[in-house]
């Protein structure tokens, strides 16, 4: 079964690129034609690249990796949050903090601070002994941290790969990923640079429906990767426990059925000896 169909890509407007005056010449090979001053992306290539990105994400997650979803532009914010939360992956959909990857130790401290403030806010006497002004300042600090960091609250280490919507807008995230040799999977619109992406998906990174559809594809890959990982872990646990493999069962059953046949001649021989 196909990951996504040509009809779905067309309906979501994935084929619409930018105006011809706003393009990156490096994207020439992904462009099918030009229509009314707009570049049309070759969706046949998009389908091929989607399959490659899907398999990479699936295998990464199957081997215990995490995918960080990144998209801070308005058109991408909802899709990034919805799809990342659906499969339990971290996400950034408001603002990328410089050093979020390259200075993760400092970011971890800010995450710890956010959780402290959340615990304080949840406790009945969390603000006891503080003035209204102090309480207001702490509340503002918590809200500010949550806005930027809530999507990565459970991210204890740098991710295995990034899914990015609009590499131009998220150029800092792309640069940090490259510095740490973290693979980047991203939508490539006609104004993007394909050289900065490891697993490109040529398509429209401005339309809400397009970003939602492609983010759904990536989250589905994560979902399948998790299933594959669970199956591997279960198989390993069974092997460690010494349980027979399912394919061994028929052989054992066959051996049991054949056993009486081997004993029959022996019984007949005993009867013959007794008669003699």
UniProtKB/Swiss-Prot annotation:
Instruction: Give the region (Disordered) as residue ranges.
Output: 226-276
Q: Which GO terms describe its cellular component?
A: cytosolic small ribosomal subunit
The set of disulfide-linked cysteines is none
Tell me if Nucleotide-binding is a UniProt keyword of this record.
no
* Protein keywords: Ribonucleoprotein, Ribosomal protein
A Gene Ontology annotation in the biological process aspect, one of them, is:
translation
Any one Pfam family match given in the protein's UniProt record, by short name: Ribosomal_S2
What Gene Ontology molecular function terms does this protein carry? structural constituent of ribosome
Is Ribonucleoprotein tagged as a keyword?
A: yes
Composition bias type Low complexity, residue spans: 251-276
Origin, by domain of life? Bacteria
Family membership? Belongs to the universal ribosomal protein uS2 family.
Q: What is this protein called?
A: Small ribosomal subunit protein uS2
Q: Which gene encodes it?
A: rpsB
